[in-house]
Amino acid sequence: MGRAKKVVLAYSGGVDTSVCIPYLKHEWGVEEVITFAADLGQGDELDPIRLKALDAGASQSLVGDLIEPFVEQFALPAIRANALYEGRYPLSTALARPLIARQLVEVAREVGADAVAHGCTGKGNDQVRFDLAIAALAPDLKVLTPAREWSMSREEAIAYGERCGIPAPVSKKSPYSIDLNLLGRSIEAGPLEDLMVAPPEEVFAMTSSIDAAPSQAQDIEISFEAGNPVAIDGVRLDSVGLIKEANRLAGRHGFGRLDIIENRVVGIKSREIYETPGLLLLIRAHQELESLTLAADVLRMKRQLEMQWAELVYQGLWFSPLKDALDGFMDRTQTYVNGLVRIRLQKGNAMVIGRSSDTNSLYISEMATYGSEDNFDHRAAEGFIYIWGLPSRLWAAARRG
């Protein structure tokens, strides 16, 4: 008896998910495999991917346009939360997984499947993200994970696929594993596993090299309403269009490349190469506007909770109660994050050079100036410092005694 009768497989067209189709049927006795591929703005033509799944043995090959919900329901909350895992990675890949899992469950319900499946390996983060999201949304559905159990190396998986008539999507000349969506690209494997090998220019697609980037700086203005980016240089754009334009501008100037060592959920360290020009640009601008519009104690607390928020998303806990509670805090603070930020793009840099908020700025020039317009009560500082330093004086006196 097979492990399931009808399975919906999260499908990308890559090695692992392609090999999963014949493997589920031939090795695990699954009667019917239906694939689902998500359009997340990766720019690929998805019809060849759909046909590839059918050629590999899928009974149905479904494609869903998830670009708008990806941006509205996942990217924008990440921008409002200034989400940077370990202070650097803006979660461009991690944000896509709960959305794909949610859609996978919906498709499974629609077609009457008794299981879902994915092609994640046993040492990556995505297996955790898919499994936890599916468990939170549909604990009754079985989750099949052939790539976690088959013990095949990448080369062996490619060979298995070729025996089943599946052409290999990579070659010895291009050994990299690449994941991409509207928010960015992640590149790993191959020569990049040597930590001292610089990523070759050929692995990048969204960003110019420093040499190729324009020498002339470009100043842009990003406008925000309630924490959401809504316009660039005064031109209002829908959320998807704004991300695309941010990608174009930042990428043209070579901003948005990351080469980092990352702590995976499963406990190992890995080298990750990312291109996330637009997302990093928008987070930087958003952070700056918050520094102008949020009270100091709110800002300090938010910075702490941002790290927690990013860790939850990275670790696959998008649908957790704690993540939901943190969303409430983030959303409440964004009421005041209205205004614009001016950024100078040049040769891989994005430097904030201006910020303003007509309605919510907490910067009072008469308080901050050292000029003749200064109306800060300097005499009040002496009493404040005395009270503020009282615990230190009492502690010092007790030690002397």
From Swiss-Prot:
Gene Ontology MF terms: argininosuccinate synthase activity; ATP binding
Binding site for L-aspartate: 121, 125-126
InterPro entries: Arginosuc_syn_C (IPR048268), Arginosuc_syn_N (IPR048267), Arginosuc_synth (IPR001518), Arginosuc_synth_CS (IPR018223), Arginosuc_synth_type_1_subfam (IPR023434), AS_cat/multimer_dom_body (IPR024074), Rossmann-like_a/b/a_fold (IPR014729)
This protein's GO CC annotations: cytoplasm
Main location: cytoplasm
Sequence positions that bind L-citrulline: 89, 125, 129, 177, 186, 262, 274
Gene3D superfamilies: Argininosuccinate synthetase, chain A, domain 2, HUPs, Single helix bin
Keywords: Amino-acid biosynthesis, Arginine biosynthesis, ATP-binding, Cytoplasm, Ligase, Nucleotide-binding
A GO BP annotation: urea cycle
Residues involved in ATP binding: 10-18, 38, 119
Reaction catalyzed: L-citrulline + L-aspartate + ATP = 2-(N(omega)-L-arginino)succinate + AMP + diphosphate + H(+)
Pathway: Amino-acid biosynthesis; L-arginine biosynthesis; L-arginine from L-ornithine and carbamoyl phosphate: step 2/3
CDD domains from the UniProt entry: ASS (cd01999)
EC number: 6.3.4.5
Compartments where located: Cytoplasm
Quaternary organization: Homotetramer.
Family: Belongs to the argininosuccinate synthase family. Type 1 subfamily.
HAMAP family reported in the protein's UniProt record: Arg_succ_synth_type1
Identification of the protein by name: Argininosuccinate synthase
Organism: Prochlorococcus marinus (strain MIT 9313)
